[in-house]
């Protein structure tokens, strides 16, 4: 994608503030118009009550905030960020997530965290890519929201197979005991930040780790939730 500084990544119109990356019109257009469960983030009847799935088998987190489904126009930007090394996209995407978080806080009283957590990459994958996209989303969020963030708060204990090609059952098995907590979280309100949540296996494994170590609450914030 050819880009010009000061123009919106999506519509190519001039930006009021060049560092925003995505204009206000496109920012509003990217938000899903579907009613989503506030806990699992999947389509539901009500946006303020847990869905039937969560009532029967709740995920190991209390709240999920997402901007949109994993579909255009956001999916191509996320793909470029991760696989074309366009790390400059991250700040614009992080701002979209911030706007969604602030909207949830205004409308539902969403609790802001004490600390946000990146989803870690295995060392070799991090080296090959040159960055962790979750870190690039967390860094501006922590600054804007005045909360703590440490890229090494959770680390990977081993390499795992690429999740994209695995079933939900194999994803869960693939990630079993794949993470280690490096910082105390007792009594803290935590948020896990990721770019895309599909089955939720990765964030579920990290959420369980945080809760086992005494975290008061765990939320998941992501750019896209596969709906």
Swiss-Prot record:
Listed CDD domains: PRTases_typeI
Gene3D superfamilies xref list: 3.40.50.2020
Domain of life: Bacteria
Entry-linked Pfam families: Pribosyltran
Known function: Could be involved in gluconate metabolism.
Family recorded in the similarity comment: Belongs to the ComF/GntX family.
Name of the molecule in the record: DNA utilization protein YhgH
Organism: Shigella flexneri
């Amino acid at each position: 994608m050819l880009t010009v500084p000061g123009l919106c990544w999506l519509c190519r119109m001039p930006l009021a503030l060049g560092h925003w990356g995505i204009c206000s019109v496109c920012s509003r257009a990217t938000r899903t118009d579907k009613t989503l469960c506030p806990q699992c983030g999947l389509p539901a009847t009500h946006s303020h009550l847990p869905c039937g799935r969560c009532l029967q088998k709740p995920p190991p987190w209390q709240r999920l905030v997402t901007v949109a489904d994993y579909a255009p126009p956001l999916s191509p930007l996320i793909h470029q960020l991760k696989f074309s090394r366009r790390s400059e996209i991250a700040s614009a995407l992080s701002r979209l997530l911030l706007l969604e978080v602030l909207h949830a806080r205004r409308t539902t009283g969403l609790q802001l965290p004490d600390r946000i957590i990146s989803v870690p990459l295995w060392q070799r994958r991090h080296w090959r890519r040159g960055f962790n996209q979750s870190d690039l989303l967390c860094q501006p969020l922590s600054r804007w929201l005045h909360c703590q963030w440490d890229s090494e708060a959770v680390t990977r204990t081993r390499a795992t197979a690429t999740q994209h090609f695995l079933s939900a059952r194999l994803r869960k098995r693939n990630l079993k005991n794949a993470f280690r907590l490096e910082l105390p979280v007792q009594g803290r309100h935590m948020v896990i930040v990721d770019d895309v949540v599909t089955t939720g296996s990765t964030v579920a494994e990290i959420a369980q780790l945080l809760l086992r170590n005494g975290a008061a609450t765990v939320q998941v914030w992501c750019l896209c939730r596969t709906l």
